[in-house]
Amino acid sequence: MRLRHKPYAMDRINEYSHIVIGNPEESAGNWKEIFGNEQPIHIEVGTGRGRFMYDMAKANPHINYIGIEKFTSVVVDALDKLIEEEVPNLKLINKDAEDLTVFFAKGEIDRVYLNFSDPWPKNRHTKRRLTYKTFLRNYEEVLVDGGEIHFKTDNQGLFEYSIMSMAEYGMLLTYLSLDLHNSDYEGNIMTEYEEKFSSKGHRIYRVEAKYRTEPMQ
């Protein structure tokens, strides 16, 4: 994806620092205070232009959401949605998710969403995939005991790699669909990419995986 430089982006992000949290490492352990309530917190790693998080937050006001996106020129589009109509249970972070464990305290997050992540198809780039074991360990660190990952992609190779990576890590796969849009799954909220790919006839793959609270026998 080619990103268009937006010279105004940082100024806008700084102006709305109550939405895009500028120094998230200073907020670790205090996110419920930032939201002003005790509601559960769900995060999306690689939130892109924010449609999924925006729609999820609107549909579920009893849950707090945080979208994490490293590209400034992309996250500013997500911010623009919230400037037009602020959603109090949604915040954004403009940082790389590799630093996830410094943004949140242990057990502070209830669920992680990974939607249409970069597949990094070359073997030498395996460690960059957001379902590589190092990332799975980081998610586990910030999730509550028994926390979940919900993952969607149109890339069959990444999907197969991801379910294998999760299983090898010891996670429990609680839901799996090889063709989400032709399944009986209810309540699916689409991302921008999902709408684009599915309209072209691409299959959408989905898996929900849960961290085990007890070691496998």
Curated annotation (Swiss-Prot):
Top-level taxon of origin: Bacteria
Pathway membership: tRNA modification; N(7)-methylguanine-tRNA biosynthesis
Cellular compartments per GO CC: tRNA methyltransferase complex
Catalytic reaction equation(s): guanosine(46) in tRNA + S-adenosyl-L-methionine = N(7)-methylguanosine(46) in tRNA + S-adenosyl-L-homocysteine
Keyword S-adenosyl-L-methionine found: yes
Annotated substrate binding sites: K122, D154, T191, E192, Y193, E194
Active site: D118
InterPro entries per record: SAM-dependent_MTases_sf, tRNA_(Gua-N-7)_MeTrfase_Trmb, tRNA_methyltr_TrmB_bact
Binding site for S-adenosyl-L-methionine: E44, E69, D96, D118
Keywords: Methyltransferase, S-adenosyl-L-methionine, Transferase, tRNA processing
Enzyme class: transferase
EC number(s) stated in the UniProt entry for this protein: 2.1.1.33
Gene Ontology MF annotations: tRNA (guanine(46)-N7)-methyltransferase activity
PROSITE patterns in the record: SAM_MT_TRMB
Family: Belongs to the class I-like SAM-binding methyltransferase superfamily. TrmB family.
UniProt xrefs under PANTHER family: 3-DEOXY-D-MANNO-OCTULOSONIC-ACID TRANSFERASE/TRNA GUANINE-N 7 - -METHYLTRANSFERASE, PENTACOTRIPEPTIDE-REPEAT REGION OF PRORP DOMAIN-CONTAINING PROTEIN
Function, as annotated: Catalyzes the formation of N(7)-methylguanine at position 46 (m7G46) in tRNA.
Name of the molecule in the record: tRNA (guanine-N(7)-)-methyltransferase
Native source species: Bacillus mycoides (strain KBAB4)
Lineage summary: Bacteria, Bacillati, Bacillota, Bacilli, Bacillales
